Regions:
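Substrate-binding pocket helix/loop in short-chain dehydrogenase/reductase
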Residues: 20-21, 28-33, 126
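Active-site helix of classical SDR
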Residues: 44, 78, 86
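Alpha-helical segment proximal to the catalytic Tyr-Lys
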Residues: 49, 91-95, 154
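Residue(s) in the substrate-gating loop at a strand-loop-helix junction
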Residues: 62
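Short C-terminal tail/terminal secondary-structure segment
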Residues: 67, 146, 157-182
Length: 182
């Protein structure tokens, strides 16, 4: 009420864990779903009544919500649920002029993945399997979010925009790529 209306909501929260599904306990699953699905659901629910036509909700998901992965079942499940929520919001609130889209980053240079990037093999595989031959930067994701909130993105609704330099197009998630000697 203090600000009168909300023009844009960007749900950008995540935690990571490389655990496979069979090693993920219920507490970990609940934590992942709480941070990456339940919180964005609640935020969208609570702000949608304050949004006007032309407003937008942007959910930051992951390439692992789009192409799957060999590890991180709780992460993929939560981000996949957020992708589904994105399309639901777009369909339900699009007639009111409120858009909802998702941005699905690939491996991006953030504090969340910093420890993984210390592993030279991980860094090399992800860099070389990306046609752009580099990892994502925060600016790559931020500029996509800004575009989706702008007039230029006004006719985009219910979409997941993958921002990974082509990484998901390379079939990275094969046993060969994960076990290759670089």
């Amino acid at each position: 009420d203090r600000w009168g209306r909300i023009d844009f909501l960007v749900n950008n929260a995540g935690i990571g864990s490389p655990k496979p599904l069979h090693e993920t306990d219920d507490d970990t699953l609940d934590q992942f779903l709480g941070i990456m699905l339940r919180a964005p659901f609640r935020l969208a629910r609570d702000v949608i009544g304050h949004m006007q036509p032309g407003s937008a909700i942007i959910n930051v998901t992951s390439t692992f919500a789009v192409v799957g992965g060999l590890r991180g079942g709780a992460y993929s499940a939560a981000k996949g649920g957020l992708t589904a929520l994105t399309t639901h919001i777009a369909c339900q609130y699009g007639p009111l002029g409120i858009r909802c889209n998702a941005v699905a980053p690939g491996v991006t240079l953030t504090p969340m993945v910093a420890h993984r990037l210390e592993d030279e093999r991980f860094r090399k595989i992800n860099t070389e399997m990306t046609p752009h031959q580099r990892l994502g930067r925060v600016e790559d994701i931020a500029s996509t979010v800004a575009f989706l909130c702008s007039e230029g993105g006004s006719f985009i609704n219910g979409q997941t925009i993958v921002v990974d330099g082509g990484w998901s197009s390379t079939k990275y998630l094969s046993d060969f790529a994960l076990n290759a000697e670089w």
